[in-house]
Amino acid sequence: MSGYQGGHHDQYDQGYGQAGHGDGYYQDDQYYDQGHGDHAAQGDHAAQGDHGAQGTQGDGYYDESGYYHADANNPYHQDGGYYDGHDQYQDDYYNNNQGYYDGEYNQGYAQGGRHPSEEESETFSDFTMRSDMARAAEMDYYGRGDEQYNGYGEGGRGYRPPSSQLSYGGNRSSGASTPNYGMEYGNGLASQRSKEPYPAWTSDAQIPLSKEEIEDIFLDLTSKFGFQRDSMRNMYDHLMTLLDSRASRMTPNQALLSLHADYIGGDNANYRKWYFAAHLDLDDAVGFANASTKNRKRKAKKGKKKGGEAGNEAETLQELEGDDSLEAAEYRWKTRMNRMSQYDRVRQIALYLLCWGEANQVRFMPECLCFIFKCADDYLNSPACQALVEPVEEFTFLNNVITPLYQYCRDQGYEILNGVYVRRERDHKHIIGYDDCNQLFWYPEGIERIVLEDKSKLVDLPPAERYLKLKEVNWKKCFFKTYKESRSWFHLLLNFNRIWVIHLTMFWFYTSHNAPSLITYQYEQQKDNQPPASKQFSIVGFGGAIASLIQIFATLAEWVYVPRRWAGAQHLTKRLLFLIVILVLNVAPGVKVFMFHGNKDGKDADQKNKDTPIDKAIGIVHFVIAVFTFLFFSVMPLGGLLGSYLTKKSRRYVASQTFTASYPRLTGNDMAMSFGLWLTVFGAKFGESYVYLTLSFRDPIRYLSIMKIDCLGDAMFGSTAATQQILCKHQPTIVLILMTFTDLIFFFLDTYLFYVILNTVFSIARSFYIGSSIWTPWRNIFSRLPKRIYSKVLATTDMEIKYKPKVLISQVWNAIVISMYREHLLAIDHVQKLLYHQVPSEQEGKRTLRAPTFFVSQEDHSFKTEFFPSHSEAERRISFFAQSLSTPIPEPVPVDNMPTFTVMIPHYSEKILLSLREIIREDEPYSRVTLLEYLKQLHPHEWECFVKDTKILADETAQMNGEPEKSEKDTAKSKIDDLPFYCIGFKSSAPEYTLRTRIWASLRSQTLYRTVSGFMNYSRAIKLLYRVENPEVVQMFGGNSEKLERELERMARRKFKLVVSMQRYSKFKKEEMENAEFLLRAYPDLQIAYLDEEPPLAEGEEPRLYSALIDGHSELMENGMRRPKFRVQLSGNPVLGDGKSDNQNHAIIFYRGEYIQLIDANQDNYLEECLKIRSVLAEFEEMKPDNHSPYTPGVKNDVHTPVAILGAREYIFSENIGILGDVAAGKEQTFGTLFARTMAQVGGKLHYGHPDFLNGIFMTTRGGVSKAQKGLHLNEDIFAGMNALVRGGRIKHCEYYQCGKGRDLGFGSILNFTTKIGTGMGEQWLSREYYYLGTQLPLDRFLSFYYAHAGFHVNNMFIMLSVQSFMLTLMSIGALRHETIRCDYNPQKPITDPLYPTKCSNTDELMGWVYRCIISIFFVFFISFVPLIVQELTERGVWRAALRFIKQFCSLSPFFEVFVCQIYANSVQSDLAFGGARYIGTGRGFATARIPFGVLYSRFAGQSIYFGARLLMMLLFATSTAWQPALTYFWIVLLGLIISPFLYNPHQFAWTDFFIDYRDFLRWLSRGNSRAHASSWIMFCRLSRTRITGYKRKVMGDASAKMSADVPRAAVANIFLTEILTPLLLAATTTVAYLFVNAQTGVTDNDKNSSSSPGFKIGPSGALIRLAVVAFAPIGINAGVLAAMFGMACCMGPVLNMCCKKFGPVLAGIAHGAAAVFMIIFFEVMYVLEGFNFARALAGIIAAMCIQRFIFKLIVSLALTREFKTDQSNIAFWNGKWYSMGWHSVSQPAREFLCKITELSMFSADFILGHWILFMMAPLILIPQIDKIHSMMLFWLLPSRQIRPPIYSMKQSKLRRRRVIRFAILYFVLFIIFLALVVAPGVIGKKFLGDTIFKALDNGNGGPANLHLLQPWGLDNNNTEGKTETGTKAGGADASATDASKLRLF
């Protein structure tokens, strides 16, 4: 250290006057020439102080070869120098001894006279800071006032940031903010360029500390704390890059000050916020023990002067003594920060960075890190630390402070089993995760919990002594859960309580108002008598009680989820009492009105329906209270009820406010738009819902409430008629309940519908407003493009030498065109037409530039193919570039002043570069095409360009090798010779040719090479811009292009870094390693961060892991690896979560600069987009330095909320690959662009990963760029967005910049992605972030947040719930319609007209309701297309939009939409119930392979196929009982749920493949019973069971044990809800409908004679017994068969197995086959017992199926113990070898017997259902050429360009043909049998078998044992009385038809 021991900084304050450092404080002769100030003594040349032994040339940082001197005094001597010879940090260009840097580096300054003031010059810009502003009141705003230099401002000259760019003019002062280094062109000093690694931080730039001094600080801290050497070097470089980046656009003093403000002391610094939140100001003042933390006020006690003058600081501080308010604390803080020297500021930042750089997982806990830093800082300033002489051992900090915390976090999720870490079977609510640990440090009560091993508290020690005691802390005693992420649906109630309040209450208001017939005493239809007004008001008023109940339940849920012991938990008792009072207020008036009504003792109905004035008044008051309750609870966040975080008075909850509720406020237009959006959404919704849903529901309510059913009931319900008829009499009520529930769901769906529509409208309006739409300035997008390039892409204001704009534009435009040519997007003739050309000018000897006609001619026709192929990638890119420049874009700053940024790409095992084998060989066994063939079909034009290019290259090579020119004759031959080029892209197998083909294919697939090459365009863009904007640089190097290129590279390297985090790099296989090496050679500046592993030092310890960094300049070592530049040891394996976030976290320490762009390994970028980078970074609003010090005490700074994340657009480059790619692309397009546009405006956008830019300091000081708890943070990036939002960061969206992004293209991989998103959303609902946002955001922001994220998934669940509840309702309505006599109903007549025939049931009105429901569901699904069509319209025009829509429809995408909706809904539901959310690696390849039927079936059966099949049977019943044409749409929806996976399977309907696949399916069903088979039905069955049972933990080391990750057993409450209650409700509803169909409604004694059975006795039927027989008999029979098989297996198995290997499978086959046969038999039995009535039989089958499902769910949920991971018990059951299972052979047989009972029935179901699905495809496979049509639909390839069928050998072909014939015969035979079983009984049963069966089963007394097994048939069910008049028949009643009955949509 340079003399700073003991903290004496006088030398520092005197201008760094240490001996040996001759540089004065400021040495910039440009500002201080001889005429000004006393500093002229430094003469024309700045003093070349002698820096110790470090040489006298330059600053002595690097010697001539660019290396740091490794001398004996250097503490790094043993390491071989700062950047030792091998691992040189600067690039190799500095080491090539070509005389580039050999000349003496002389810091000569311009020898000219004084320079004109910058403020007078024309280039005075916002970046120029006026010096008189800087020295207001003789106080330096950038640190302390330097008394010595107070007079330096007289010249009135502003300060321009220095820069790396030298100015090469003599006497000049304008320029791109550059000091003058004064080399005239003729000086011959061109080679003496700055060797500075950090050019803006050099001694010429008035820097407060030189980089050597900063390095000394790092060395000193490292020796005092024991940080790692490599980590220190890494963090030193990190800090210097930050200072260099900031100092390139502001003064170095400002740069350092702003950096310190961002990290430590400013208003937005997380450390400062934490310091006050955790009351550490009090701890520092009086100690926690003496501070009463309970009732601190925020405000100062005495009214303070708002801002003391600087001089009064001491006085003000004295006044504030003893005042512990927040204001006083903040004043003291600012004073302390203001007095701090720049040296101390650097030291604090350095200490923070060193702690952060080694913090590993602790980086996920930002406040824990703040605490560690605070302890370290207190220790650093203590005398004990300053007195240290011996350096502390390396790794001390890591081992003592970080590792114990790391181990605690790891042990929460993992335990050691047999020496290996195994995941614990714990769910989130039992894991103390990163957030729980972090929240310990939010409150003083938490910090007080930190105890040492000796049980003393850490806070009892003085602050300076705490750091050394951290190693003794017993962390296990400190941490506890601060929020329980239990799997429960109540999270939705708590987090989104306002959604439920708004919808349920409004629904109640609407529906209760429209149900007068339910509350009228003795309602009569022909009178239409109304209830008293009091009751009408009061019934509506009960809505307030619903709102209050929701709030009460939400509060109780909060009680459960937020442990009371956490200091941040709100006090809920007061709130609960308040809510109970509100509930009583909302119920009491209604109780009076309904139970103690004034006229309740009236004589007749009319009297009782009259009102008293008091009742009426009470009713109105009740209604008014309800409305106010509703409004209050809708608007008020739950967290804001009665004293909470949201009250600003007390300091009690500052932490929760700071870290969970610091939302950036919306202002101005944004706020207006937010309110406007939600007012229009809910205005439209409430209007439409009232008219369409509720008003039209009025008539069904009326008719169902008066419907009377005469039925005989069921004999099983008792002996009296009343009990027997109990269910069937109430069928109308049951239907009404079901209809109301369905209506309620539609009420929710409506809102989302309007949100989508209006969001789209607002978004489009905004796109017109900013000009990003194709329609806005359409006429001049291209003609103005050159001008826009000049004004928006180039920073020309500061240019030294003024050129004509055309010269500059032409360079940029030509570069873009040539880059497209190089990527083979344009052919050479296109390029010629697009380039600017030099042509001879009219003036003699001069040349001029001719612009391409493209810019003009584009206006005549929208696109001409003469410039580029239509619909090509080139056209898309150029038109987006042109369009984007027509939008408002921030002005770019010169390259020199732009901030440094890093692109970060996490990589796990994604393809780096495709191998030749992958490209030209059919890899998939089921694929029909090579990848190259497929790519050639997709990009024909680009392939042609590539081939031409390759041929030119080959010809050139041939000529160079001296081959003769070709003659005429050869030309014909060469065409044949060229075939290989067109076929595979090369003729010679030399690596340079094959590599070209590999690269071409890789650049069109989803590979890391594509991503890296795309994002390396930033480097090209920076070089291009620097060259174009600084022509003097080009002139200076004259013709030496090599040196010029180096200079440009230096600039690019300084401003941009690309880090790929290759987690597995050190474990790569040979091929992967070669590919990575190829990347490094192609892009030497690419940096790769990876995990390096070393064996443990001692036996039994853990291996040591390191974060290492290499780049293309790193030296290759003997083992083939490269020598890392930095290698930082970690506490252990950093991958504790799902992987991606841990991967990002370990590499984050290697990011450089101010911003990070996070990129996935399947993205792409383009040169023209990279040119806009300066404007994109300007969106962070940090380009212009703030001229006020953040540390002036008493001055309130305007705290502007920092921009944390900037989202960008994505273009999905897989959109032209076929229907699925297009649908996926469309989804992303609308979500990522259309909705992001409005959501960012109204503050509802979060962070979705991909091309988003992050504010580095903001995010890294708040927990990093993603969260990482396993499972919980599955969608890791969105949590970073929520974290940024709740902590006060803004999230913006950038409209004019877009990256490419790949999306998965196969059906399976798209649905994997869907499942991942769905389960991830389930996890988000459990998370604390959702709780904070849901209970604290203001209403408009809350709605934006909800509908943009959770609402989408809730809506999907509601859609599927609505489909299911609608089908159940429809089944009940069908039953009602089937059994009752319809009325002659005319909706146009008055409702008081009598309905005929008398006693009829008006079910026609119900059919109107059914029609409206179908229309609603149609719109709900259709709406998903609207945003995409509108987006296409605005961005690409009418024709393209229409084309895309037609293509999607013809490709049957509506089927796919329905299916995806179900997958979303299912994955969210199953995650909330069972957990198991995990990262699913989604496929990156092309889906051209056919997937076997069995695989598809097993993948989607549980998620969708079973669900669809159940509903389809209900729909079949509805079709046969309540048909109307609109039901056709439902057939489409439900078929979509079943057949989508097969419909989107490539070549599914190819004749041969179909039958080969059928054979596979039969094998899949039967295998796995003799030895374990991963792809078998039994494995699928067991796997679907395990999510309920869980696995046994004991590992038996069997191969079949690896079938799945550990699945924890689901919670009992969740199992009850999803596995027991839901199936029970389903079984009950279907059973009720079945019983009603059999209840003999309207049967009278007159029917005796009409019965087809003589001797028939009228009476209740035995439908329940019939149902029980059909439901339970198959189970009983299966159990019997199994018992017999089990006996045989045990007795004969062990013996027979020796000779008959197939004994087990044969037994299994017999049992399974018998089960399937019995199931079919009992279907027929039901048919017979129902008298061959199809509808009744079907109702019975549906009910029996639901009952069986319920029984099996009960067995699996309650009776089964955990599953073995191996398949042993299943195999043992069939072959009898139980002895191999040890002790388990006692318990397992019984368990396995229960399993087998369920399995047999499930097998039968799968066998029958699988066959029916295959039979559905029969009509399709018979269509000729179906495969071609199907492929056109899937891949959008014309028949001429389609993929050829695979080629088989003769032997294979014969074998396939034989198999096809065999299995085709089997298929069609089974098809005929199945059809016969369904159709025959209905056709011939009644005719031939009727009487025989009747006599056999029913001898006139109800059959055997009087069971009434047979349903009577032939009865006419008609007890109506024609036109007999009934009731009052109020003649001439003037009641008109209600509005509702007139409602028809079409």
From Swiss-Prot:
Reaction equation(s) it catalyzes: [(1->3)-beta-D-glucosyl](n) + UDP-alpha-D-glucose = [(1->3)-beta-D-glucosyl](n+1) + UDP + H(+)
Glycosylation sites: N171, N290, N1017, N1312, N1649, N1918
Summary of pH dependence: Optimum pH is 7.
A GO molecular-function annotation: 1,3-beta-D-glucan synthase activity
Ranges for region Disordered: 1-127, 152-198, 297-316, 1920-1946
Location(s) in or outside the cell: Membrane; Cell membrane
Thermal dependence: Optimum temperature is 37 degrees Celsius.
Transmembrane segments: 489-509, 537-557, 576-596, 618-638, 675-695, 734-754, 1356-1376, 1413-1433, 1500-1520, 1523-1543, 1615-1635, 1667-1687, 1703-1723, 1738-1758, 1803-1823, 1864-1884
EC numbers: 2.4.1.34
Enzyme kind, highest EC tier: transferase
A GO cellular component entry from the record: 1,3-beta-D-glucan synthase complex
Membrane-topology annotation of the record: Multi-pass membrane protein
Biological process annotations from GO: (1->3)-beta-D-glucan biosynthetic process; cell wall organization; fungal-type cell wall polysaccharide biosynthetic process
Keyword Thylakoid on entry: no
InterPro entries according to UniProt: FKS1-like_dom1, FKS1-like_dom2, Glyco_trans_48_dom
This protein's UniProt keywords: Cell membrane, Cell wall biogenesis/degradation, Glycoprotein, Glycosyltransferase, Membrane, Transferase, Transmembrane, Transmembrane helix
Biased segments, Polar residues type: 165-180
Documented activity regulation: Activated by iron ions. Inhibited by manganese, copper and zinc ions.
Similarity field: Belongs to the glycosyltransferase 48 family.
Role this protein plays: Catalytic subunit of the 1,3-beta-glucan synthase (GS). Synthesizes 1,3-beta-glucan, a major structural component of the fungal cell wall. Involved in cell wall synthesis, maintenance and remodeling.
Subunit structure: Component of the 1,3-beta-glucan synthase (GS) complex composed of a catalytic subunit GLS1 and a regulatory subunit RHO1.
Protein name listed in UniProt: 1,3-beta-glucan synthase component
Lineage of origin: Eukaryota, Fungi, Dikarya, Ascomycota, Pezizomycotina
